[in-house]
Design a protein with these regions (language model features):
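Short, conserved phosphate/pyrophosphate- and ester-handling motifs at nucleotide-, phospho-/glycolipid
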Residues: 143, 223, 312
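Histidine-anchored nucleotide/phosphate-binding helix
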Residues: 224-236
Length: 340
């Protein structure tokens, strides 16, 4: 079996090396060598394992979320869960070495301490980690996610954390009930005190330090969760960036946790919140498409902002296209797509 030498450079210049056969994904080959690179869906839909090929040739399935031709600048981007090598490779990873694991992701037990319906079909779930060999603290980077095992199944589901690291072991999520969703169906009958198995933290959708550039956060429905985590960390650290939030939903009744955003507005004096509702709005929300709203604001922005976007593949691609058209460098658009 032919194997090719793979050399991967993390953003902070650390080097990872592993062999990979031509019928094995780069992600699987790394894991076979106990190098666990950030990933999520493993089917090519979420984009969490995107990397860039510096030298060499790969065979790669196109991202399932976007069948348009890649621009020349993005032509070397690959999904590590889909790409297989056809030569030795040098690849660049868009995250620091600290996000690479060399041992299995911790699995822990957590107890449901609160479960509230905050909008039609949307739950606010609060868990408390059970004390174990890791202690009881919840340690993670703002913007990361956890996987939760659906009770009675072998299926894990990924949900972004909306709170920040804490000693009490608290994990908070907002979760949409979808018709085909196993975990949302479970939540309909869940009870306080139920114990769930969780795995993480995972993910590299985190705040980046680029000086005092303005930060614009764009969240589609429950995609607001990791952005709330980032905003809370900014408030805790007293960061003074000009910051703007675009909270996009279909209907006004889909807006939730507005009290949390109001609290953050009090703690972050430079924070501006824009709620964008596709359907006709009556209570002060902006009626209109979030992409068009973003477009108008970018046209008058004094400097290009750093953009953080989380939501559907369509939203992420739409934001990416629009902000880069206004001169925001692609590398300063940070995103996380919902898995499909």
């Amino acid at each position: 079996m032919t194997e090719f030498a793979i050399t991967a450079y993390t953003r902070d210049g650390q080097v990872l090396s592993f062999p990979c056969s031509r019928d094995e994904s780069l992600l699987a080959a790394a894991q076979r060598q106990d190098i666990i690179l950030p990933s999520q869906c493993r089917n090519g839909s979420c984009g969490a394992c995107t990397a860039q090929v510096r030298t060499g040739t790969v065979a790669a399935n196109a991202p399932a979320t976007d069948d348009r031709p890649l621009s020349k600048a993005a032509a070397r981007n690959v999904l590590l869960c889909q790409a297989t090598p056809r030569s030795a490779l040098i690849i660049d990873l868009p995250y620091d070495h600290t996000f690479v694991r060399f041992e299995p992701v911790p699995e822990r037990l957590a107890e449901i301490t609160a479960l509230d319906v905050v909008a039609p079909g949307t739950y606010h779930l609060r868990l408390s980690l059970v004390r174990d060999a890791y202690g009881c603290a919840a340690e993670f980077e703002a913007g990361q996610y956890m996987e939760i095992l659906v009770p009675g199944t072998t299926q894990w589901r990924a949900y972004s954390l909306m709170n920040i690291t804490n000693w009490e072991g608290c994990l908070e999520f907002v979760i949409a009930r979808r018709p085909e969703g196993l975990f949302g169906r479970y939540l309909e009958t869940a009870s306080l005190g139920d114990r769930l198995r969780v795995k993480g933290p995972l993910g590299v959708f985190t705040l980046q330090e680029n000086g005092l550039h303005p930060r614009w956060f764009i969240g589609g429905h429950t995609g607001i969760a990791p952005l709330l985590s980032m905003l809370r960390r900014m408030a805790d650290w007293g960061e003074g960036h000009p910051v703007r939030v675009y909270f996009a939903v279909h209907d006004e009744q889909d807006l939730f946790l507005m009290d949390t955003l109001e609290d953050l507005r009090q703690r972050l004096p430079a924070l501006e919140v824009k709620t964008c509702v596709s359907a006709p709005a009556t209570r002060g929300a902006h009626q209109g498409n979030v992409i068009d709203t973003l477009d108008a604001d970018l046209a008058t922005a004094p400097v290009p902002p750093d953009c953080y976007v989380c939501g559907s593949p369509r939203l992420v691609q739409g934001v990416m296209d629009r902000v880069t058209a206004h001169g925001v460098p692609r590398e300063r658009v940070y995103f996380e797509r919902f898995s499909v």
